[in-house]
Amino acid sequence: MKRMLLLLLAISLVIGCGGAGMQRASGSVDFTASKYTGTITPGTWVHEQIRYKYDGEEALVNLQIYFPKNYTLRKTYRTVIMLHGYRGSQRDWPANSSIVSLAELYSMAIVCPSMGSTLYESVYFPETTNKWGPMPGGLFVSNVLVPYLQKTFYLATKENYTGIMGNSTGGRGAILAAERNPNMFGATAGISGDYDPVSMPRNRLHASVYGPYKDFPERWQKIDNPMELAERLKGTPIFLGHGDKDSVVPKEQSLIFVVRLNQLEKDGGKYIKVNKVYPYRMHNWELWSKSLHDVMRFFDEKLEK
């Protein structure tokens, strides 16, 4: 097992060929956010829509926010953004887990955006066939969602009070968000996430955004690759969880990411990580609802109170 992980790691760090002209995201985003004028009843969900425009194309994103019973407006409040899996919705975590009771237990506001089929990419290409919206999903989280929460609900206003987590593709998204925005999130967690695209060159989801690996290996290695960006997690607490019977995203995706963090740590960095493999668990809500207890406890320990 260890030899296989090291081999995968070596492949991920070395491969960098292929004539794919790398393309960075370009475009202008326009959205208006102002203080919420509706009624917030602590102990309930608020359902909202974010309206934004990117390169002239307008879009709406649904989200729901849980405000615990002791919530006080304008108080700096601990906030956890919860990302769902591929083609999920803002209803996934509330419907399939005990997030409300955990939010009450740890006094945290919970934000569940509807992110559709995004892979939390930062750019689209001519070969991209999977566009969840006009703006790449990875950019939306940092450039629209978080500023909206800050301006409208006074949530996620401080890094050390804000966490981000996700399951499956959302786990990849949470880790990427923390890597890209080290001053925005005080802790991050990924459950059943995929973090090393180069080790899965036949992954059709990844190809739907970045083009086929055989044609664009440099994109797969250099763009939106959590392994490549891992160094930016220095000082950010990270929780990784995976079921050992996961046949959709193999547990080696989390294990190899830990190997990468350990390697960076040996080079002098400080990486605060928790890695948990859940015996006899697969890629489903039985695991994700169970592991949520560990993740929320982790956020309670790592985020400021």
Q: Language-model features: where?
A:
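Structural motif marking the loop-to-transmembrane transition
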Residues: 1-2, 201
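Sec-dependent signal peptide recognition
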Residues: 2-8
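Bacterial N-terminal signal peptides
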Residues: 8-16
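Non-catalytic cap/lid and distal C-terminal segments of serine-dependent acyl enzymes
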Residues: 18-305
